[in-house]
């Protein structure tokens, strides 16, 4: 399995279902890669076609297969509304090294709620040896001692 750095460029979303009945939505995205969570800025007043153009970095390790992108509408005084979620498979970027901006379906309760545009790139870790750094498994090393 790949170990390395995943760069995620959160570009935009289109055709989102409006979760705010009185005003334009203020959408933001929570990105989750295994146990790592990162949030985008709030696209204030951008409604159903927000643009973020933000870059996020995740550390990829054994068993990482997908990235989740959950879209929320920021509300003041009440809990933020969940707009929907996209599941982005990572195998293509592990093979290709980079994926240009691509649309992924946003769904909620198995219903289509729009699309999110994301670009991906992956840089494998260097000097990986069975998942351990050389120094962590007691490899022989020249002594710095002088006599």
Curated annotation (Swiss-Prot):
The gene coding this protein: PP16-2
UniProt keywords, alphabetically: Calcium, Metal-binding, Plant defense, RNA-binding, Transport
Span of domain C2: 1-103
Organism in which the protein naturally occurs: Arabidopsis thaliana
PROSITE patterns tied to this protein: C2 (PS50004)
Protein's recorded name: 16 kDa phloem protein 2
GO molecular function: metal ion binding; RNA binding
Function, in words: Binds to both sense and antisense RNA. Can also bind sheared DNA and dodecamer DNA with a low affinity. Interacts with mesophyll plasmodesmata to mediate its own cell-to-cell transport and potentiate RNA trafficking. May play a role in plant defense signaling.
PANTHER family named in the record: 16 KDA PHLOEM PROTEIN 2 (PTHR46502:SF2), C2 DOMAIN-CONTAINING (PTHR46502)
Gene3D superfamilies: C2 domain
Biological process terms in GO annotation: defense response
Annotated spans, Disordered: 126-147
Domain of life, source organism: Eukaryota
Cofactors required: Ca(2+)
């Amino acid at each position: 399995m790949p170990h390395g750095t995943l760069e995620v460029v959160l570009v935009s979303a289109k055709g989102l279902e409006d979760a705010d009945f009185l005003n334009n939505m203020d959408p933001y995205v929570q990105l989750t890669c295994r146990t790592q969570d990162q949030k985008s800025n709030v696209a204030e007043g951008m409604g159903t076609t927000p643009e973020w153009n933000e870059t996020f970095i995740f550390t990829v390790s054994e068993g990482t297969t997908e990235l989740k992108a959950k879209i929320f509408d920021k509300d003041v005084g009440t809990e933020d509304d969940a707009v929907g979620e996209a599941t982005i498979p990572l195998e293509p970027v592990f093979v290709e090294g980079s994926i240009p901006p691509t649309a992924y379906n946003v769904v909620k309760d198995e219903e289509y709620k729009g699309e999110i545009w994301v670009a991906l790139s992956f840089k494998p870790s260097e000097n990986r040896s069975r998942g351990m750094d050389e120094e962590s498994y007691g490899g022989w090393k020249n002594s710095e001692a002088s006599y």
